[in-house]
Amino acid sequence: NSTEMIRALLSGVEPEAARLKPNAEAWSILEVVCHLYDEEREDFREHLDFILHRQNETWHAIDTQGWVTQRKYNQQNLAEMQEKFFVEREKSLAWLKGLLNPDWEKTYTTEYRTISAGEMFACWAAHDNLHIRQLVELRRVRLENITRPYNLDYAGDW
């Protein structure tokens, strides 16, 4: 499952290496972990609950790009943020298992769009894959830095 893939991709990453960014616009491994933690708590589970059970409440906005600097993602403790994310993920999995006959076609309309419960759930899974890909790419950059001056072409096309 994607949780275990994320856990494996974070395994063995030293705190200082987790803060490295390939360029000024890119996220570090630590920033990805912090983002996953915030998304787990404040976006996907929360908004899926809005769609399924809280139609009369106001959908709250998220600011994924802003949170990176506002919440000082790259200054956080890697081990603590990993633990926080995995605890939240367990809460999410328990919450999902506790849903009784969810209506995946039920929709919620925000000021931006209408989204169904099924679409939100599918996007949650897709979001994990997006960041799994990002973590793989960040690990590749890390490997390039560690193995320099040697080139990695023989390993295959990247």
Where are these regions (language model features)?
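Short low-complexity stretches enriched in small and charged residues
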Residues: 2-5, 45-51, 86-89
